[in-house]
């Protein structure tokens, strides 16, 4: 079933591949606790001890990594839909 045209399906393919690569890499960097991404963590302003801060930062890093990987999986679904549409459009124009 054709839902979108050939240009939109190709655009969806390109954007999906880029989104998958970017989100997988961001998830990896969050998972290894990259210091450059600490500004993106939902942390409180003050903590009672350094151990509390480290525990909260580790939880936030892991949660952000999982969120990135879940979003990458959603992009895989978009990639599959765009690929199916691209195939359907190329099949129609070949006939």
UniProtKB/Swiss-Prot annotation:
It comes from the Eukaryota. The chain crosses the membrane at residues 12-32, 68-88. One of its GO terms (cellular component) is membrane. Its main location: membrane. It is a multi-pass membrane protein. InterPro entries: RNase_K. Keywords: Endonuclease, Hydrolase, Membrane, Nuclease, Transmembrane, Transmembrane helix. It is found in: Membrane. One of its GO terms (biological process) is cellular response to virus. Its EC number is 3.1.-.-. GO terms for molecular function: RNA endonuclease activity. Belongs to the RNase K family. Endoribonuclease. (Microbial infection) Required for the initial stages of clathrin-mediated endocytic uptake of a diverse set of flaviviruses, including dengue and West Nile. Not required for clathrin-mediated endocytosis and macropinocytosis. This is Ribonuclease kappa. It comes from Drosophila melanogaster (Fruit fly).
């Amino acid at each position: 079933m054709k839902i979108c045209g050939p240009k939109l399906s190709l655009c969806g393919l390109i954007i999906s591949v880029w989104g998958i690569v970017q989100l997988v890499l961001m998830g990896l960097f969050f998972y290894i606790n990259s210091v450059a991404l600490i500004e993106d963590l939902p942390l409180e302003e003050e903590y009672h001890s350094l151990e509390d801060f480290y525990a909260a930062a580790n939880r936030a890093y892991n949660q952000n990594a999982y969120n990135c990987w879940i979003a990458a999986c959603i992009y895989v679904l978009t990639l599959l839909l765009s690929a199916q549409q691209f195939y359907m459009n190329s099949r129609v124009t070949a006939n």
